[in-house]
């Protein structure tokens, strides 16, 4: 028995791919409907507006980020090694052709207005990443955990922006993000 993908899921997957690869403002509901092969009426039945679809995509991206984070770090025995594992995986990702930057940074760039519905979702995601970095930095014995967390946060976002700007080029500024993270972590944790 063949299982079919629900139209809502097809619409969402299509929109997610298009938003990530081309941006939020560049993609309209006509493009999503055409690419998915599903009519606009069905799209609007599931997502009353493009903004609703963007917010749903951001929530899904947040869930995916944390699932990946846990998967990447679960084998690392210490908090220091969890941070290092994350940045090694980040380096691999930002240098891959599958990376188009960070969906949350991309959103904030295209919709800088604080009252935009997706803006708060992006801020909440970024704050939770900073908090997790800070927790791991404290557990790793960093002399100044908040300072380390902020530096790692900026390094991560810089790597995402480099991926968006330079693509998967080995000459990308993100090509040594894991090495720089290790220097920051080791400098703060006394290694």
Residues of each region from the PLM?
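Short hydrophobic/aromatic patch on the recognition helix
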Residues: 37-47
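Hydrophobic alpha-helical connector segments
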Residues: 56, 70-96, 139, 149-152
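Amphipathic alpha-helical segments used for helix-helix packing
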Residues: 96-117
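Hydrophobic/aromatic-rich alpha-helical bundle segments in the mid-to-C-terminal region
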Residues: 119-124, 139-188
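Basic, helix-initiating cap at the start of DNA-binding domains
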Residues: 1-22, 26-38, 52
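Short, solvent-exposed amphipathic helices
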Residues: 71, 117-128, 132-135
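A secondary-structure capping/hinge motif
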Residues: 51-53, 107
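Alpha-helical DNA-contacting segments of helix-turn-helix folds
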Residues: 54-61, 68
């Amino acid at each position: 028995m063949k299982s079919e993908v629900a139209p809502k899921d097809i619409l969402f997957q299509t929109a997610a791919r298009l938003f990530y690869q081309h941006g939020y403002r560049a993609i309209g509901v006509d493009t999503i409907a055409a690419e998915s092969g599903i009519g606009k009426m069905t799209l609007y039945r599931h997502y009353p507006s493009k903004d609703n679809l963007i917010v749903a995509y951001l929530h899904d991206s947040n869930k995916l980020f944390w699932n990946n984070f846990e998967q990447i770090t679960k084998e690392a025995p210490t908090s220091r090694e969890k941070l290092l594992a994350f940045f090694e995986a980040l380096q691999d990702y930002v240098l891959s052709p599958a990376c188009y930057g960070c969906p949350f940074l991309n959103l904030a760039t295209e919709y800088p207005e604080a009252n935009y519905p997706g803006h708060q979702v992006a801020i909440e995601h970024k704050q939770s990443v900073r908090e997790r970095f800070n927790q791991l930095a404290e557990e790793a014995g960093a002399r100044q955990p908040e300072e380390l967390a902020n530096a790692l946060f900026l390094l991560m976002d810089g790597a995402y922006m480099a991926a968006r700007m330079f693509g998967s080029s080995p000459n990308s500024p993100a090509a040594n993000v894991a090495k720089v993270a290790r220097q920051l972590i080791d400098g703060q944790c006394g290694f």
